[in-house]
């Protein structure tokens, strides 16, 4: 009997390979705001006329929202970074779970569906696993506007039972300035009968961008970006053309990329007052930041020292940049403290950063960081969108090579990230499933013998 040698093959899942320790240079281009684009796309359901949204980033979240709108009966035409939406023939009031479970912004459709069709059935939404983000404030706001809302088997069922099928204006006070709840109430009240006020609303730039587009459609929204928003309901809204604001979170990520690689960079386009808290902390930790032309910022890192931050709603330090800033603090001189006050499960990057040589101690939602001279390349994994960005920044600054898995998270919020970073001088490339026998990849390698087992467990 002849013996047959068995070769065990290993597979690396789709990943980024990063050669760290290289300075960046030039310009990092900022795309349109993802979070703004998603709300604007949902708002297109409010009118029977065509609506053109420009400067929309190419992201998987945008693709999911596009599919949701098509499922409702809307017609979409995409050209480069523009999307034309025609919602004249929407007819479906129920969203499928397979689309909604991965995108929290899908819940934005509830208000427009109520105003257009008088009914909506939407499964409780998903998104990044960063802690509880209940839709209670959304539901309470819709109820205040006269909608009948109930949650049955994790499906939100809402309808308008008034004789004319219109919601009714109301005075609403949010317990917490939730961005999503503010946007839901804002869209639902535009076509309501009478006057609506939202006290303690979210003041984020994305709220202001939504209000600006709604007003260009014929809505009457006043006070977006302040502590009280007033909406005077109108009979109908028209189509319009609107350009999405620059993504302040991507811009902040790029500013931190410059700081962590100790590289002078130009970042833009940006709206500086959307980044005031971030710019302030970067200056405090040792960066020079100045206006460069009308729409760009120039950042020059000098000597990075530890500073403390606490996340809070706008205009405070954004929770979406907590993780990237922690990567920077991991390489800063001295100690720092980062407190997360918006979400209770947003420290998934700490373990991966420590794997790269960072010295971070986590106590509840506060991270205590002792800066190290340098991070070391490693095999690392992102657990959500912003932790993935933080880990990529760490890989850029680290000594040696890194393999990053978790592209499904990164692709949700950063358009063509590796292409932009490559243009700025980094060595970073996207790789797909590969066969390898290198032991250095061991903690990210999946044995073919165990693939089915792991799929079943997931």
UniProtKB/Swiss-Prot annotation:
Pathway: Cell wall biogenesis; peptidoglycan biosynthesis. Phosphoenolpyruvate binds at residues 34-35. One of its GO terms (biological process) is cell wall organization. Belongs to the EPSP synthase family. MurA subfamily. Cell wall formation. Adds enolpyruvyl to UDP-N-acetylglucosamine. PANTHER family: UDP-N-ACETYLGLUCOSAMINE 1-CARBOXYVINYLTRANSFERASE. This is UDP-N-acetylglucosamine 1-carboxyvinyltransferase. It comes from Prochlorococcus marinus (strain NATL1A).
